[in-house]
Amino acid sequence: MRLRNKPWAVKLVNDHPESVLQNPNPDEKIYWEKRFGNDHPIEIEVGSGKGHFITTLAEQHPEKNFVALELQTTAAGIILRTKLKKGLDNLQILRGDAADINCFFDKNTTDVIYLNFSDPWPKSRHEKRRLTYKSFLNKYQQVLKPEGHIEFKTDNSGLFAYSVQSMNNYGMFFDFVSVDLHHEKPEIVEKNIETEYEHKFAAKGNPIYALHAHFETK
């Protein structure tokens, strides 16, 4: 979902190249260890929106590095504002297209990829744009470590069913599946970090669908 344009966001993003990498050339290597200043494990959220999920995660886990992959400048600006306010040195913002994720990260370098409330692209002619389409799964497999995994959440039952089928057809294995995440066991609910959209949808009584899945290790 596109956010309303915030005029201040462009200047803020442009003023902080140390925190926001904008539209990098897919053919040029990104040195993440240099940008973070360490070689800690990396986790990526594809499509971070206003960034509540990824900034909370970064705050809770200073021992890890996080990348918010987000195309919209306004969203990047909102995330950056939170990052600066909280002093999250372990969070980088990447303004780029998710279709280039395998160009932005080297093979076998990422621990987790988060897909939270992605655009469902309900029309069949837009299937290839869904972030759980097989071509995207192939790219995630390239950048994830052999022991890495995907965590996916949505309120859209159609996208969830499609994603389960797509991942199953790709040969992935499911570690966790829920058709009502907010009514799971207390220990699962307590660990869940809500996104802005998730909070809104759950407040309306909508079930939240979730899964964790990994690729076959060779």
From Swiss-Prot:
Keywords: Methyltransferase, S-adenosyl-L-methionine, Transferase, tRNA processing
Protein name: tRNA (guanine-N(7)-)-methyltransferase
Interaction with RNA: region residues: 125-130
HAMAP family (alphabetical): tRNA_methyltr_TrmB (MF_01057)
Organism, scientific name: Lactobacillus acidophilus (strain ATCC 700396 / NCK56 / N2 / NCFM)
Sequence similarity: Belongs to the class I-like SAM-binding methyltransferase superfamily. TrmB family.
GO MF annotations in UniProt: tRNA (guanine(46)-N7)-methyltransferase activity
Gene coding for it: trmB
SUPFAM superfamilies recorded: S-adenosyl-L-methionine-dependent methyltransferases
Function: Catalyzes the formation of N(7)-methylguanine at position 46 (m7G46) in tRNA.
Entry GO terms, CC: tRNA methyltransferase complex
